[in-house]
Amino acid sequence: KTKSDKNELLFISNIKLTNEQIDGIRSLDFEKDGSSSINVEFSKTFNKVALPINTQVNFSAMSFDAPIYDPKDSPKFVLLSSLLRNEYLHKRVREQGGAYGGGATYDPFSGTFKMFSYRDPRFIETLEDFNNSLTWASLGSFDDDMILESKLSVLSDIDKPSSPAGEAFKDYRLNSENRSQKNRQTYRNNIFNVTKEDIVEAAEYLKNKPR
């Protein structure tokens, strides 16, 4: 990882290193001349692409521009994704549509909200289900029990144990993005505080975004 004018090396091992191995890592020279900053310009584009292949099933996906990580706003979108996945898309895309899998996810790091299906015998109808799911949520067509189930699902995913190496990498990544332990706890607490109105607001936000 390049940070400011210094290069950082993150080294994670599942085995105990010998002193010789540790000394070897410490002896590596990562210094370099000049500035490490690179100016790159990006422009957002939204493409609608279909790639026909000789198969009876499809992979379909739809993505939306969503807010970058914020302890206050992000919980609304992560709960919306869980609600759509478990209460709407599972029934429409998998049970009724016949897809092997599908769902919705929100990535706060990239600011992207995604819906997808795979091994899906349908195509256009599935895309319509994606759009209709946001209409369903924006109309508040869900109850408090569904919201509670979504909160428990999200918190279970946050709290699930990982390997020591996985925990080390996760902690490094979050700290490098200025997400302190206090910041993360605030995010977790805010998941409890999300209301039905918050989820409706998040759905309305995505409905008005290009895809």
Predicted regions and their residues:
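Substrate/cofactor-recognition hotspot
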Residues: S82
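M16 family metallopeptidases and their MPP-like homologs
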Residues: K1-N14, F59-L79, L89-K196, P210-R211
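An aromatic/glycine/proline-enriched structural segment found at the starts
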Residues: E8-S60, A66-I68
